[in-house]
Regions:
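Short beta-strand element of the alpha/beta-hydrolase
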Residues: 25-35
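Primarily recognizes the serine-hydrolase "nucleophile elbow" in alpha/beta-hydrolase
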Residues: 94-156
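C-terminal catalytic histidine-bearing segment of alpha/beta-hydrolase fold enzymes
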Residues: 205-239
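Conserved alpha/beta-hydrolase
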Residues: 49-73
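The serine-hydrolase catalytic nucleophile loop
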Residues: 36-48, 62
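The feature captures the conserved acid-bearing segment of alpha/beta-hydrolase catalytic domains
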Residues: 144-202
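N-terminal cap/lid segment of alpha/beta-hydrolase-fold proteins
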Residues: 1-25
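Alpha/beta-hydrolase active-site loop
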Residues: 78-102
Length: 239
């Protein structure tokens, strides 16, 4: 049994899930980020599955999404990379709030996400060594080059603030903790080549000892039951 509800964390509305009777107890905690044009509620099956496995799950709405969306779809579609950047800069306050409320057990804080959320997870891993482990599904850490083809910004300078979180020149920061990469080979939004590139770079540098990379044939840009199960297994093993 689990408990599922809405809480504000650092002023941001989140979906909050825990095993029943544990809402105010310290638990190993997963901060999980949703995809672009989606919301915390659409991805709530991750909260359910992970809470059933014993974790606290905190799923924020990204800027201009879910409870934070004002209905201006055209504006949102032009702000992909700026929204990703906002995910990065909001993390510190959310983490601090969770710790201040005594909700994270023994510094066991993980980050996961899918699509834009998977990009968020990889970027945060480069800057936050305190994160215990990371799961990135359908994501990429190569923001500065991916922006050439995925939601290219009208102003190329919009990508510049993402440099600090791009994985290209800091692979070692992805190698010192467990990392799960999952991607559907037939992904028609974020190419699976993004995950393959990262996995290959880690292997070639001898930095893959804690890497789990799973690629599913014939799967497009969607989360499968197998991907959900792999994510739960990963956090059960490493968080």
């Amino acid at each position: 049994m689990i408990e599922l509800g809405i809480r504000h964390v650092a002023g941001i509305e989140t979906l909050h899930a825990t095993p029943v009777g544990s809402q105010d107890r310290a638990l190993p905690t997963v901060l999980f980020y949703h995809g672009f044009t989606s919301s915390k509620l659409v991805y709530s099956y991750f909260a359910v599955a992970l809470a059933q496995a014993g974790f606290r799950v905190v799923m924020p709405d990204a800027r201009d999404h879910g409870a934070r969306f004002d209905g201006d779809e055209a504006h949102r579609l032009a702000q992909f990379w700026q929204i990703l950047h906002t995910n990065f800069v909001e993390f510190d306050a959310m983490k601090a709030a969770l710790y201040a409320d005594g909700l994270v057990a023994d510094d066991r804080l993980a980050v996961g996400g899918a699509s834009m959320g998977g990009m968020t997870a990889l970027g945060l891993m480069t800057q936050h060594p305190e994160i215990t482990c990371v799961a990135s599904l359908m994501g990429s850490g190569y923001f500065t080059t991916l922006a050439d083809t995925l939601f290219p910004p009208a102003d190329p300078q919009a990508i510049a603030p993402l440099d600090n979180w791009d994985v290209t020149h800091q692979l070692d920061r992805l190698a010192d903790r467990p990392l799960l990469l999952w991607h559907g080979i037939a992904d028609d939004v974020v190419p699976a080549a993004q995950t393959q590139r990262l996995a290959q770079a880690l292997r070639q540098a001898g930095l893959d000892a804690q890497l789990t990379c799973l690629l599913d044939e014939g799967v497009k840009h969607r989360i499968t039951p197998a991907a959900l199960e792999a994510t739960v297994r990963f956090f059960c093993a490493h968080l």
